[in-house]
Amino acid sequence: MKFSTIFGATTVMTAVSAAAVSSVMTTKTITATNGNNVYTKVVTDTADPIISYSTTRTVVVSNSDATYTKVVTEGPDTTSEKSTTKTLTLTNGSGSSTNLYTKTVTQAVESSTSSSSSSSSSSSSASSSGAAPAAFQGASVGALALGLISYLL
């Protein structure tokens, strides 16, 4: 099924700092449309911590033909009284070929005493250079896109 639009609305009760991570509950309402059909899913889980600095993880995968490197960079996140902005950047490369994917999500924050509209926006971009094997590029684009979506939802 192909979703034509995905919107997320989030209510976060308390902001969590990277230094003191605690279990804070958050409720996300995810609405997806497919033609005339509208699907809604409500998820309650612990809130992601606010990352106040940039952190990078590197994953190296080797097989008999090549070595592939994936670099995931998160943060820094910014927080105001009304919203939190999270940025996730994925870099996937093979040799001289590099694919860069960035997604930024702004989540509305509500305190327990006030009520405001929740909204979510995202932007993504992809660029590539070099000549990695087509099968690797196709598989990596799909895997990274799926990883981005599952991480941010």
From Swiss-Prot:
Major subcellular location class:
secreted
Pro-piece positions: 131-153
Biological process (GO) annotations held by this record are:
siderophore transport
What top-level branch of life does the organism fall under? Eukaryota
Membrane topology of this protein: Lipid-anchor; GPI-anchor
Region (Disordered), start-end ranges: 73-98
One Pfam family cited in the UniProt record for this chain: FIT1_2
Its function, per the record, reads: Involved in the uptake of non-siderophore and siderophore sources of iron. Has a role in the retention of iron in the cell wall and periplasmic space.
Which protein, by its recorded name, is this?
Facilitator of iron transport 2
- Recorded source organism is Saccharomyces cerevisiae (strain ATCC 204508 / S288c)
